[in-house]
Amino acid sequence: GYVKEGEDPLKVAAEQLKRDNVDILHTIGGDDTNTMAAQLSNYLKDNNYELTVVGLPKTGDHDVYPLVQTLGAWTAAEQGAIFFENIVNENTTSTRQLIIHEVMGRNCGYLTAQTALEYNNRVKNKVFLPELLIDDDKWGIDAIYIPEIDFDFQLEAKRLKKIMDKKDGVNIFLSEGAGVEAIIREMESNGEEIPRDAFGHVKLDEINPGQWFAKRFSKALNAEKTLVQKSGYFARSAKSNDRDLQLIKNSAQLAVKYALDQESGLVGMDMDENGELLLIDFNRIKGEKPFDHKEKWFVDILRSIGQSY
């Protein structure tokens, strides 16, 4: 409602900032938030209005160049693990149950992978009672699907069918961005319109990758019950853990310093400067940073569950 049809959003925002006599703008968000802030700053400069913009990179997706770590990513992984730690107990309620844990991550599998690592570390501390059918196998992760790794559905279905037959259940960690291209192709072939947001991103909550995969895997695995649970809001609404709080504190203190010195940029851990926390030129900020799926710890997880990598 702030920008009427035909108006330039940058001009509308700039004029409002000028009317309010704002000369320092702190932006907190992901790549879209901070690249738009940079455009706003440049627009105002071109129109003889000095605005200092200092951004903080808050996104659980952890998909921003050139950052080593984004604010909230550690917490999101920890909370996603806690979420699944509760949800997975549903495996006791029926036979041949398929549980899909859908994790945030449009173009980046970092959060799904890190959440899986956190979950595995937590489940190691649990006590199981196989004689009461409370076996650690049924609490284990059987597949992890992320945007960075393509996979053959038929081969995976065959592998998971064997697991379902053996342990009476299958647990999948699915990045919300995994397989999106396949879903889009199917929708377009059916003449369906692809819903997109203001930034041109596909609205993942509307095309619902979790349900799409659930429908196909459920049939292929002869699942008697299928449960799809998204940890996104649970993780996003959680209070920051200690690691994130310390990074937030350090980042905010630097952000205030740079703002008072009238220096614009994004405060973050620069991967090109050995992870040092400093002011990064907005022009270097880009989204869609992929997860390095060749990281040893992640390869070890996939190898342990028999999934191709």
Predicted regions and their residues:
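Glycine-rich oxoanion-binding loops at beta->alpha junctions
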Residues: 1-23, 32, 60, 71-73, ...
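Accessory alpha-helical/coil subdomains and C-terminal extensions
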Residues: 16, 27-29, 35-50, 70-224
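Short, amphipathic alpha-helical "lid/cap" segments that border enzyme active or binding sites
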Residues: 10, 14, 77, 81, ...
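Acidic/polar active-site rim loop that often engages polyanionic ligands
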Residues: 56-69, 93-96
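Short, ordered loop/turn segments at secondary-structure junctions
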Residues: 30-31, 56-62, 149-150, 176-179, ...
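Short beta-strand elements at the ligand-binding edges of bilobed clamshell
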Residues: 64-77, 239-245
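C-terminal non-catalytic interaction/assembly regions of soluble proteins
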Residues: 179-309
